[in-house]
Every structure is written in C-alpha cells, then in structure tokens.
Amino acid sequence: MNELKDFFFLGKPIQTEIGEIDFIRLKDYPLYTKELSMLRMNKKSLIKEYSRFNEDGSLDPFIIEMKKRDLYEIVHSVLPDFHEAYFKVFSKVLINKDSLSLIGKHNFPRLRKLILDMHCITEDKVVDNDELQEFHDISKSLKQQDSQSDLKDIVSCVAAFNGYTYEEISEMTMYQLYLSFYRMAEVMNYNTTTLFATVSPDVKVSDWSSHINLYKEESYHLSTKDAKNIEQLFGG
C-alpha cells in the first residue's frame, strides 16, 4: 500500500481490497482523537503500558495472555475498549459500512497501517532492552519539548501563508495540513537563505521543492496536546 501515499494529498478515498477508505477531516477530529491514539498502540506498547501498572504482579496472567496473541486477537478478544475504538474508527472511514464484515486477521495489519498512514500517525517505538527504552523515552520527551509548533500554530500559519479561512482548513485532512505547513516552511527557508546568499558566499541556498517525509519517526503524530488543540479549534 506504500504506493497509495503518493495520492494522499488529494484527500480522496483510497481504494482497498475491502472497499474505499476515507480520511477523517480536521473538523471531525474532536470525536476521534482518543480512538486514533489507541490505534497507534501496537502489541509491544500495549504490553508495556499494562506492565507499568503491574507492580504487585496482579496483571501477570493478563499480560501473559497478551504476549501469546497477535494484535488482532488482543483487540478483538482481550481489550473491549480497544475493540470499541477500532470499530468506531473503521465505521467512520469505511465508505461502505458493510465492509466491516470483511475485516479479518489476514488483512487487519495492512488496513490498520493504511489508516495510520492516512492520518500521519506513527506507532510508538518500543525496544526490549529496558535501558535503551529509557534512553529512547528521554530522547522523545526532549524532542517534543524542543518543538515550538503545536497544532494551532500550524493551522494559523497555513491560514496566514495560503490565505485559507479556518473553515476551509477544517475540511482538510491531517495529511494535507502537515504537507502544506512543511512546504510553506521550505519556501520560507529558501527565501531566507537566498537573501543571505547575496551577502555571504558561504550560505547554502535550500531547495524549496525538496521531498517532505511526513513519516519520520517521532516527528509528525497526533499528541495529546494536539488533540486538545483540535477540540478548541474545531470542536465548537
């Protein structure tokens, strides 16, 4: 399904083996932010999360059971809340609701990955080594603290730079919003480096049309802070 990403910018439904899957628009995100965050959790991150609350060992049988199963089985047989979350999201994005019955163990991973990609959501990275995991978590936290742009900043920049109204942006997909914002940043960087290049030969002029990867690890995902900002912007 990787080749389908080339057409995500159109915001049109994506044809799959079970029918068309549509994007969730920004205006509808307040109703789905929690569920999309739950879809982001893979088997390892679920086990890690439950292990955090297992200091007394009371959850050992439950965690052992999850380790025996794949994500599809965990979602459909072990964690009712996650089953409801997946059902809510799939019911929203599937054009033909009858296609829900076509989702099974054989195609669940591909469809889940497609939905995550369509909404610029990346899975949490979980490593087996505790020390490496701690280092990764610290690194992730520092990167998030270092980031100065939250969702409302991104929306306001896209509105100001492109002349969109907030109503028009509310009809965008998350992919379109991020793509517009980071292309805008490349253009602004190009203009800045071009200006400085006139006074300093050492300045390298950036390429405003360079490839934008919206799937860099930890770089672009819907955080809890973003979710709250969406609710404030489009939640009415």
From Swiss-Prot:
Top-level taxon of origin: Bacteria
Protein's name in the database: SPbeta prophage-derived uncharacterized protein YomV
Species name: Bacillus subtilis (strain 168)
